[in-house]
Design a protein with these regions (language model features):
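Primarily recognizes the serine-hydrolase "nucleophile elbow" in alpha/beta-hydrolase
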Residues: 86-152
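Short, well-ordered alpha-helices that flank and scaffold nucleotide-derived cofactor binding pockets
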Residues: 49, 53, 114-118, 180
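Serine-hydrolase catalytic machinery in alpha/beta-hydrolase-like enzymes
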Residues: 6-98, 200-213
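Short aromatic-enriched loop/helix-cap "lid" or pocket-rim segments at secondary-structure transitions
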Residues: 72, 111, 149-151, 173-174, ...
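The feature captures the conserved acid-bearing segment of alpha/beta-hydrolase catalytic domains
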Residues: 124-187
Length: 233
């Protein structure tokens, strides 16, 4: 399916930030993509283009890089505010709303869907509203934000969860724990990729990062195909 691709600025509380829009012709759904710590959806563009080719308009905000591996309440809430601006402007009641995120981006999607996230210092983060996502595709999400009792009790949506066995940022044991928690609320499609690390799900790796995948091209093509099938099913 044809789609157009543009990058433009929008405003949140009189502050401008950038979004990339991949607008599908006669879109079946709207996908909100949330990048990880680095904040750039450009590193995931081949994946997002495949999703758009399957008939979904993709909205991908750009964020400033988080300076620390342990982000603060203020830093995460700033991202959530930008995401809520995007959701208000681009989600429509007549279109299916889907979230797709990597790492801390996947964590923020769970918070937007009703998860009660706590930072490492014990401060709560979260949106002004709970957003009704029909599906969430979560790639190597940061899990520690949701390990307190009842944290994900109000998340009620179909989940696609994928993690790498060689991930040292989000270890497989944490991903399996998240799967067990989410299964209490609904259906979870879980894939544990044997050779994948935390950054294997990025089409463009961060500087000085080497991937554990022996054949990145084949892996990324399969990843994009699987996610596109999930969001359009």
């Amino acid at each position: 399916m044809d789609f157009s691709e543009i990058t433009q600025s929008i405003q949140n509380n009189k502050k401008e930030f950038t979004i990339t829009i991949l607008e599908a012709t006669q879109a079946l759904c709207v996908v909100i993509f949330v990048a990880g710590r680095g904040g750039s959806p450009v590193r995931h563009l081949p994946l997002l283009r495949v999703v758009a080719q399957h008939g979904c308009t993709v909205i991908a905000p750009h964020f400033e890089m988080l300076p620390s591996l342990t982000p603060t309440k203020e830093e995460l809430n700033a991202r959530i505010e930008q995401l809520e601006t995007v959701l208000r402007d681009y989600s429509h009641s007549h279109q299916t709303l889907i979230g797709l995120g990597h790492s801390i981006g996947a964590t923020l999607l769970l918070a937007l869907a009703g998860g009660k996230a706590l930072t490492f210092s014990g401060h709560g983060i979260g949106p002004h509203s709970i957003w009704k996502f029909e599906r969430l595709a979560l790639l190597a999400p940061s899990v520690d934000f949701f390990l307190h009792p009842g944290a994900l009790q109000t998340v009620n949506t179909q989940i696609y969860l994928r993690n790498g066995r060689k991930d040292t940022v989000t270890p497989p044991s944490k991903a399996l724990l998240l799967k067990q928690i989410l299964e209490k609320q609904g259906h979870v499609d879980f894939l544990l990729d044997e050779e994948a690390g935390h950054f294997s799900y990025m089409d463009e790796l961060p500087p000085q990062i080497e991937d554990s995948q022996s054949n990145r091209e084949v892996f990324l093509v399969d990843l994009a195909r699987n996610i596109a099938q999930f969001v359009t099913t």
